[in-house]
Amino acid sequence: DKPTTKPICEQAFGNSGPCFAYIKLYSYNQKTKKCEEFIYGGCQGNDNRFITLAECEQKCIK
């Protein structure tokens, strides 16, 4: 059995990962029910990250 991963929009908001790049991306925040900007470090993190606000909203806001 494969471990089930949470749907992208339910994964932790704004997971920057351990690296030190400075990439502005968007992530869905379950607490505010909005897509918000965060800084991504460039490696690891999770799948709750989108290049544009529109892409985030299209995937996560019903």
UniProtKB/Swiss-Prot annotation:
Chain segments annotated as coiled-coil in the UniProt record: none
Pfam family, one: Kunitz_BPTI
Bridged cysteine pairs (disulfide): 9-60, 19-43, 35-56
GO cellular component: extracellular space
Record key words, sorted: Disulfide bond, Protease inhibitor, Serine protease inhibitor
Record site: Reactive bond: 20-21
Molecular function in Gene Ontology: serine-type endopeptidase inhibitor activity
InterPro entries noted in UniProt: Kunitz_BPTI, Kunitz_BPTI_sf, Prtase_inh_Kunz-CS, TFPI/VKTCI-like
Record CDD domains: Kunitz_SCI-I-like
Domain BPTI/Kunitz inhibitor: 9-60
Cross-referenced Gene3D superfamilies: Pancreatic trypsin inhibitor Kunitz domain
Purpose of the protein: Inhibits chymotrypsin and thus avoids the accidental chymotrypsin-mediated activation of prophenoloxidase. This enzyme is required by the insect immune system to produce melanin which is used to engulf foreign objects.
UniProt name for this protein: Chymotrypsin inhibitor SCI-I
UniProt organism field: Bombyx mori
